[in-house]
């Protein structure tokens, strides 16, 4: 009997990529392959790459080169495989296969073909696949947290974004499928489910004829998971129905990740954002009135072609005025295959960097003030880590999403994966500190 090769998976990029990796692991394990976390011990390494911006591509390339130098058989999957295809096979002879973003479910067949000596290119030009609750999945997050993909792809064509080219048009899963997977996750002991897609507020539009996020949230209210968090909510999609569903569904956290990208109408129009110039004060003010306890995270792009000092100052004033809880700032990255790469008035990197640094400097005291409002409160904290040297516990309250926001450093005793009441005693720019409240 032939021994099956050992396989490792190197995951790079976003949560959507993570879910693809988790499905590949699940499928391979089901097929009898040993999946090892140690790349040095593996015969094959699947590198699930990111190609969203230049920095992400550089990280993917570094990983591929290091593995090639270690003489590993490399399977390149994900966004770079979709983006560059034959170019990767030509430049990296150690690559034995390419697997596109709509083809990860074929990973077992791909490995079997490479074992026979074939160089495999499994990259669909029309990307239509989305995994459901029946596809094996091995989660790589900590046991208490899981990402749940409600849709894949995007129907918008923002000038700076290559995602529709890499992941296809939007395709949503039926509500019943999502609820079924949420119940599976609850049975596994998951305490927090994070709903993701490219534009979560557009969920269902492609299969139901109109967005159905409100109905999905209400359906998920019946699942025994304490926290459900929404990522990537477009402000114009936060309809009264969605806001009412958030208010009425106790396990839906009032946390909103709003990818606003800019405030000035000129720049929003140049970006071809779906709301064009309609991100204004009223939208944010109405949202805060409707959800007064909402935790608001947003991201901005500075240095977009044609952004003047006046445009940038408009954004600075917008950030000062609305005091978001969490802000991420990215410099514009000109991506091949997007309209923005050909726009006039491209800005030097030095200007982009200085604007990013200036905006973050303005946001930091705002973030500190928002965190300081928690001092004296008792908040629920999901315990995720323990510092073995000090015994200090580390977790997150509802105001912090994994990886992108802060942490809560906790004194006291609690089991990993449990949610406990913590009295907040101190705060800084990013994190909170507190003590477990004994019952």
From Swiss-Prot:
A GO BP entry: tRNA modification
Q: What does the record list as coiled-coil region(s)? A: none
Give GO terms: molecular function aspect only: 4 iron, 4 sulfur cluster binding; aspartic acid methylthiotransferase activity; metal ion binding; protein methylthiotransferase activity
Q: Where is the TRAM domain?
A: 372-438
Q: Quick check: keyword Iron-sulfur in the entry?
A: yes
Q: Do you know which HAMAP family this protein is assigned to?
A: MTTase_RimO
What's this protein's family per the entry?
Belongs to the methylthiotransferase family. RimO subfamily.
The name under which this protein is listed is: Ribosomal protein uS12 methylthiotransferase RimO
Q: Which species expresses this protein natively?
A: Picosynechococcus sp. (strain ATCC 27264 / PCC 7002 / PR-6) (Agmenellum quadruplicatum)
Which gene codes for it? rimO
């Amino acid at each position: 009997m032939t021994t099956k090769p050992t396989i490792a998976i190197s995951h790079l990029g976003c949560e959507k990529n993570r879910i693809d990796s988790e499905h590949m692991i699940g499928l391979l394990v089901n097929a009898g392959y040993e999946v090892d976390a140690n790349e040095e011990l593996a015969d094959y390494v699947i590198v699930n790459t990111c190609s969203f911006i230049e920095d992400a591509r550089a990280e993917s390339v570094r990983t591929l080169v290091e593995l090639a130098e270690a003489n590993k058989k490399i399977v390149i999957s994900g966004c770079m495989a979709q983006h560059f295809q034959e170019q990767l096979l030509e430049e990296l002879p150690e690559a034995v296969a390419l697997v596109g973003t709509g083809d990860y479910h074929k990973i077992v067949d791909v490995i079997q073909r490479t074992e026979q000596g074939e160089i495999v290119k499994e990259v669909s030009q029309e990307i239509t696949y989305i995994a459901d609750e029946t596809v094996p999945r091995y989660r790589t997050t900590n046991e208490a947290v899981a990402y749940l993909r409600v849709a894949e792809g995007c129907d918008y064509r923002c000038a700076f974004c290559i995602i529709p080219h890499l992941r296809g048009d939007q395709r949503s899963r039926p509500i019943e499928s999502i609820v079924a997977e949420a119940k599976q996750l609850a049975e596994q002991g998951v305490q927090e489910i994070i709903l993701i897609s490219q534009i979560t507020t557009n969920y269902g539009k492609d299969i139901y004829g109109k967005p159905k996020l409100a109905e999905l949230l209400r359906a998920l209210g019946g699942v025994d998971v304490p926290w459900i968090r929404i990522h990537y909510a477009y402000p114009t999609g936060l309809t009264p129905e969605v806001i009412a569903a958030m208010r009425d569904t106790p396990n839906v956290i009032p946390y909103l990740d709003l990818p606003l990208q800019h405030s000035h109408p000129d720049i929003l129009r140049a970006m071809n954002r779906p709301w064009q110039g309609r991100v204004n004060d009223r939208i944010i003010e109405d949202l805060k009135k409707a959800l007064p306890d909402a935790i608001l995270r947003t991201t901005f792009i500075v240095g977009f072609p044609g952004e003047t000092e006046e445009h940038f100052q408009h954004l600075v004033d917008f950030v000062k005025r609305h005091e978001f809880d969490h802000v991420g700032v990215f410099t514009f990255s000109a991506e091949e295959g997007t309209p923005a790469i050909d726009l006039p008035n491209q800005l030097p990197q030095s200007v982009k960097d200085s604007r990013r640094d200036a905006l973050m400097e303005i946001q930091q005291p705002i973030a500190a003030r928002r965190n300081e409002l928690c001092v004296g409160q008792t908040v629920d904290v999901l315990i995720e880590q323990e510092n073995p040297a000090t015994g200090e516990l580390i977790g997150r309250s509802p105001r912090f999403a994994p990886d992108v926001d802060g942490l809560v450093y906790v004194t006291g005793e609690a089991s990993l994966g449990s949610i406990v009441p913590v009295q907040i005693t101190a705060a800084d720019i990013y994190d909170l500190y507190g003590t477990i409240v004994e019952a």
